[in-house]
């Protein structure tokens, strides 16, 4: 779909002002190869209007010169990477904005990151296209995270600065959804629950094995001590001993055996692992995953049910966390974190007897809500962008400490670039996927009787 950015936001996304330039054929989404076949005719059409030409209008019957350029690419993350020529989020070099790799996903020092450059990406894409074998192309894309896309044929299009990170999928259905369902455990995915149960069982078995090994080791120490008590150690002439060596005795043997380190090592760890720079320590469940208590969850549900909200705001499910209410919609996540949770969460984690952990949970929630209010606003400034980065980096630092069972996801890294995007494009909700998803819903509800070529959608 094409939108006219010359129109103000309240008119820009109306159906009558939206041009549906094409519909991907069913039943499957195009892959990175076939997407180029769909983009080629679109890019050829856009290239014709790159040079100014005259168009007669009501106000200018003799014609007015216009130029058409397709600049910001707005899509969900999967489609965005395919269309812009970057690799998927599972790749080693998964980010379209910087050169961070998967093993650096927890890095919060954004000043140390090496950002991508549009011209460099275009050159890398040309090298990929000029490679003559599939093996060579695979090697190129693994080393750069870039492949060719038809949009590179547009000379003005910047693959880095003209790619917009979708506010809907990245933040609302990414960061907020992950915090609610995964970190807080409200409606946690069955796979995540099973993974935690498996890890907990593995930890219990490991602790049992270590305990048994420690008992056996203690028995061996006792047997060695009893056996050494019967040894007769003859004295040696004084001149045959090294100058700094103490005279051996049963006491020396006993004390050495009693001071033998008995701290157990995990059976999955090797002594040399600690000196391996690539070593990743095994996951520890000393602190169980966070879950709200039953009374806290009831308080949250009561707040959802009794809070007064505007008539145009849809109330989230009052049985939040129960699988029976189905999947939450994007606007429900936004309502929860901007209107409902700020009223009830402080009552759960703030008080004279609040523990240090609860204080950190509340501080983490504060940073998340502050970042959400900024990124969801329809106004933006450089100061707001900097404030967003402060709150978001603080939030990520806290979730790394409070929720060690759940590593960061690519979405968390992508959101680190929202500050720069706000400085470049302004308010991100004005360039979000909400409007495109609404049109998708309209198209999906159109009855074609499985004869798309004979329906009005072809005109």
Where are these regions (language model features)?
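Core catalytic machinery and nucleic-acid-binding channels of phosphodiester-processing enzymes
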Residues: 1-10, 37, 327, 332
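Acidic, metal-ligating active-site segments
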Residues: 1-28, 100, 374
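Short interface patches used for recognition in eukaryotic signaling and trafficking proteins
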Residues: 20-33, 164, 281-289, 319-327, ...
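Well-ordered, non-membrane alpha-helical segments in soluble/globular domains
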Residues: 35-43, 121, 125, 362, ...
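Generic, well-ordered alpha-helical scaffold segments in large soluble proteins
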Residues: 38-41, 45, 49, 98-101, ...
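Domain-level detector for long, ordered catalytic/regulatory cores in large eukaryotic signaling
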Residues: 39, 47-332, 454-459
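Short glycine-rich, low-complexity/disordered patches
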Residues: 51-68, 383-394, 401-413
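Amphipathic alpha-helical/coiled-coil segments positioned at domain termini
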Residues: 76-126, 317-380, 400-459
């Amino acid at each position: 779909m094409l939108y006219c950015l010359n129109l103000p936001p309240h008119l820009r996304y109306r159906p009558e002002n939206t041009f549906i330039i094409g519909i991907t054929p069913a039943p499957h989404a195009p892959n990175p190869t076939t997407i180029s076949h769909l983009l080629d005719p679109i890019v050829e059409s856009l290239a014709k209007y790159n040079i100014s030409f005259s168009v007669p209008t009501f106000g200018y019957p003799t014609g007015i010169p216009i130029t058409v350029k397709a600049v910001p690419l707005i899509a969900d993350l999967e489609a965005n990477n395919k269309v812009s020529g970057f690799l998927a989020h599972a790749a080693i070099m998964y980010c379209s904005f910087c050169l961070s790799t998967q093993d650096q996903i927890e890095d919060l020092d954004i000043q140390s990151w090496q950002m991508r450059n549009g011209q460099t990406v275009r050159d890398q894409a040309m090298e990929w296209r000029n490679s003559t074998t599939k093996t060579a192309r695979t090697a190129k894309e693994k080393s750069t995270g870039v492949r060719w896309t038809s949009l590179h044929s547009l000379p003005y299009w910047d693959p880095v600065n003209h790619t917009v990170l979708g506010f809907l999928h990245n933040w609302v259905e990414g960061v907020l959804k992950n915090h609610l369902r995964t970190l807080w455990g409200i409606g946690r995915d069955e796979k995540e629950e099973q993974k935690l149960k498996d890890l907990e069982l593995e930890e219990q078995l490991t602790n049992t094995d270590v305990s048994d090994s420690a008992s056996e080791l203690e028995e061996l120490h006792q047997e060695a001590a009893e056996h050494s008590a019967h040894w007769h150690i003859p004295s040696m002439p004084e001149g045959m001993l090294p100058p700094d060596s103490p005279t051996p005795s049963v006491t020396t043997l006993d004390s050495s055996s009693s001071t033998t380190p008995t701290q157990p090592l995990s059976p999955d760890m090797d002594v040399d692992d600690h000196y391996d720079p690539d070593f990743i320590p095994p996951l520890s469940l000393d602190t169980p995953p966070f879950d709200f208590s039953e009374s806290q969850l009831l308080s949250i549900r009561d707040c959802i049910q009794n809070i007064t909200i505007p008539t145009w705001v849809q109330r989230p499910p009052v049985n939040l966390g129960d699988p029976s209410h189905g999947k939450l919609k994007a606007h429900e996540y936004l309502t929860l974190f901007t209107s409902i949770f700020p009223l009830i969460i402080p009552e759960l984690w703030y008080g004279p007897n609040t523990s240090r952990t609860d204080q950190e949970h509340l501080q983490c929630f504060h940073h998340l809500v502050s970042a959400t209010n900024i990124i969801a606003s329809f106004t933006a400034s450089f100061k707001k962008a900097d404030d967003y980065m402060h709150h978001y980096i603080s939030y990520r630092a806290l979730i790394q400490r409070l929720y060690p069972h759940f590593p960061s996801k690519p979405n968390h890294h992508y959101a680190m670039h929202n500050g720069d995007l706000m400085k470049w494009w302004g308010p991100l909700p004005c360039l979000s996927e909400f409007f495109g998803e609404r049109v998708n819903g309209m198209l999906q509800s159109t009855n074609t009787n499985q004869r798309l070529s004979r329906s009005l959608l072809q005109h």
